[in-house]
Amino acid sequence: MKEVIDTVGRRKTSVARAFMIPGKGRVIVNKLPIEEYFKDEFKRQQALRPLVITERAEEFDIKINVQGGGVSGQSGAVSLAIARALTEFDETARVILKTEKLLTRDPRMVERKKFGRKKARKRFQFSKR
């Protein structure tokens, strides 16, 4: 077993690197406790969901560096990074996390803006005359 488990999670344009070591359950995101970084309860729960589902929230200290995107993308990236770290530590957790679809990278990205349109799909207002 490795001392430090290093994994990467991505969502939209966010990239999270998680470093997991055995410990007391502290989660640090960009040098801040997770409660301070993800102030929204839902985003925090989304990020910590793999730990809660596998019931290993108090077993590891996790340090996470996350950059890019917004809060939603970052919490998704953190969730994937933690899930991958848990599977690297314990293969039996893989089955649980896979059934909850926490090991799948969400492929949805923002659609690019097209020329001749206001946004990706929205057209300019049509004027008949």
Curated annotation (Swiss-Prot):
Cellular component aspect of the GO annotation: cytoplasm; small ribosomal subunit
Signal sequence interval, chain numbering: none
SUPFAM superfamilies given in the database record: Ribosomal protein S5 domain 2-like
Gene Ontology MF terms in the entry: RNA binding; structural constituent of ribosome
Gene Ontology BP terms: translation
Alphabetical keyword list: Ribonucleoprotein, Ribosomal protein
Family that this chain belongs to: Belongs to the universal ribosomal protein uS9 family.
PANTHER family documented for this protein: RIBOSOMAL PROTEIN S9, SMALL RIBOSOMAL SUBUNIT PROTEIN US9M
Protein name as it appears in the record: Small ribosomal subunit protein uS9
Organism whose genome encodes this protein: Pelodictyon phaeoclathratiforme (strain DSM 5477 / BU-1)
Gene: rpsI
